[in-house]
Amino acid sequence: MARAVGIDLGTTNSVVAVLEGGDPVVVANSEGSRTTPSVVAFARNGEVLVGQPAKNQAVTNVERTMRSVKRHMGGDWSIEIDDKKYTTPEISARVLMKLKRDAEAYLGEDIADAVITVPAYFNDAQRQATKDAGQIAGLNVLRIVNEPTAAALAYGLDKGEKDQTILVFDLGGGTFDVSLLEIGEGVVEVRATSGDNHLGGDDWDDRVVEWLVDKFKGTSGIDLTKDKMAMQRLREAAEKAKIELSSSQSTSINLPYITVDADKNPLFLDEQLTRAEFQRITQDLLDRTRKPFQSVIADTGISVSDIDHVVLVGGSTRMPAVTELVKELTGGKEPNKGVNPDEVVAVGAALQAGVLKGEVKDVLLLDVTPLSLGIETKGGVMTKLIERNTTIPTKRSETFTTADDNQPSVQIQVYQGEREIAAHNKLLGSFELTGIPPAPRGVSQIEVTFDIDANGIVHVTAKDKGTGKENTIRIQEGSGLSKDEIDRMIKDAEAHAAEDHKRREEADVRNQAETLVYQTEKFVKEQREAEGGSKVPEDTLNKVDAAVAEAKSALAGTDIAAIKSAMEKLGQESQALGQAIYEATQADAAAAGAPGGQPGGAEPGADDVVDAEVVDDDQESK
């Protein structure tokens, strides 16, 4: 069965993790890094670059490089490249495809399932767009999980013996969340969450860019905002400066040849940015994190002193000003620093993927009922309908009410297990009852029925008792994109993957051919320049020269089949040359005789073999 992974699809960087022997492991990408920049670029030769390679070429390919697209998730943003429109889910899918490939390379097997995290403050459209991106990337998205919940799982705080109140402060590249969770005796409950989907590290970078633009304009009179390439260089320098100021009191920003003046003379940007100045120009951004924190505290009605642990998530929380603000808001509590804030969410997602793996859609097949069967109800609680050790066949029903006013549908999630919180049990499947008439919360009555036959097959139905409407089990794939659009994007992604494979194969063939040409030319040259002349006839060397010329001619073109053919011929001629040299060397040795008077240069008895043991001195001395 294919493995499932946990993915943190971030604004600035993305991370993938997988369970190995029950423990989560962050997977390094093909470039050797544990984080992958969420950057996608369309090169002019048709190649699509993702991650660090895309980020590296951004300066020279500004208009065809996409970054921070997560900020547009769920909206109608799109970009047109070479007369083709790309949506946010499509661009995000490119990042997910790379993470998928890197994880498959690490595991040595295919990956089909994934848990993908989103900010807790994401709305339904943003969550669906994230799920669409996963589908386009060829992933079966088991669940969209809130980042604070994943972070709490990764920190292992859900294993505490006593009740604990956890504050998760998540400041990423483009979004901000603060959530309060109550944890105890295996129960994990999100009490309240608040945030800002347009506040993150990118905004701090933008302030530094604005500061640099103003400084340069003041000294040169030139407005760099009109130069896209210069602005990309400023953005990269700003991000680097922000990171350096987390550990230093000041940093130098030096960008040679940033632009030219009216006389075409090159101009240089050289500024010194102190941590104090950086904090001054970004103070209002920091202050924007206060209101969501205060909102969460007010919504739960707890005191700041009741917070037991503070968890920092997201690379932007490394900024000293952010850490100090969190300590101030929480009454001086030191944040928990047990896990890398860049990786903690992906680690939690991998743990959640381990919980959810094994889901079967539409038909739930159980060999026996050793564990209780139930559904998730409000607060994430596991409500049991059939207790463990129940004799089958059996049929049980229970009536539930809606949790919100005018709730139009009910998502029925079926679990197996004994834990009190549904998420801690095994998710077997889910389906949705739609078309519930508008009514205040608690008025609509939904009857859920579990029917287990003698074969152990479980059938689950949900019925609105008011209208008599009944739905069969089906996984609802409601989408911001139509099914046809998603199918088209999936096919495009698959075709692109095939193109990538072809390009890599072509590059490998070219590299092999070029290496063979170089080595062969060098070998032939050494033979001709050898003392006493070459040991093989000139016509043999000429044949090799001809094969080398043919290979070079093929390499100058684009026909890979021709390159392979020329390389094969060159390989044969090279082998023939090697054989000729070997035979010539043997003939010379035979003609000259050898020490000891034996033809062929062997001493008498040289063919005798002596058996011996190799003794380890250390072992012998013991």
Swiss-Prot record:
Induction and repression of expression: By stress conditions e.g. heat shock.
In-chain residues carrying the UniProt-annotated modification Phosphothreonine: 175
Annotated GO MF terms: ATP binding; ATP-dependent protein folding chaperone; unfolded protein binding
Keyword Transmembrane helix applies: no
Residue ranges of the region described as Disordered: 589-608
Family to which this protein belongs: Belongs to the heat shock protein 70 family.
Function (record text): Acts as a chaperone.
HAMAP family on file: DnaK
Name of the protein this chain belongs to: Chaperone protein DnaK
Organism: Mycobacterium ulcerans (strain Agy99)
